Amino acid sequence: MAEMITEAAILTQQAAQFDQIASGLSQERNFVDSIGQSFQNTWEGQAASAALGALGRFDEAMQDQIRQLESIVDKLNRSGGNYTKTDDEANQLLSSKMNF
């Protein structure tokens, strides 16, 4: 079986990039929400219902995307920590066996 080598620092960097994407989506979501609220008083009838429904679906979809990205960030950060811990434990075990 091939050896798997993982750079914990790269996992952390990737987590930061996903976190930036989630943050950007949150800002865009807030921007769209504010536009929708500003027009809300001028919409009437079916147009208002359709627009509010569309904005609601958009908001739900954006929130789901943000949650998914936050989950990826959490998993990448935990994975990086786990790999570092495993490497440290392996180094300590090797050092103790070889009397370093």
From Swiss-Prot:
Pfam families: WXG100. Its main location: secreted. One of its GO terms (cellular component) is extracellular region. Keywords: Chaperone, Secreted, Virulence. It is found in: Secreted. InterPro entries: ESAT-6-like_sf (IPR036689), T7SS_ESAT-6-like (IPR010310). Belongs to the WXG100 family. CFP-10 subfamily. NCBIfam families: WXG100_ESAT6. Forms a tight 1:1 complex with EsxA. A secreted protein that might play a role in virulence. Might serve as a chaperone to prevent uncontrolled membrane lysis by its partner EsxA. This is ESAT-6-like protein EsxB. It comes from Mycobacterium leprae (strain TN). The lineage of its organism: Bacteria, Bacillati, Actinomycetota, Actinomycetes, Mycobacteriales. The gene is esxB.
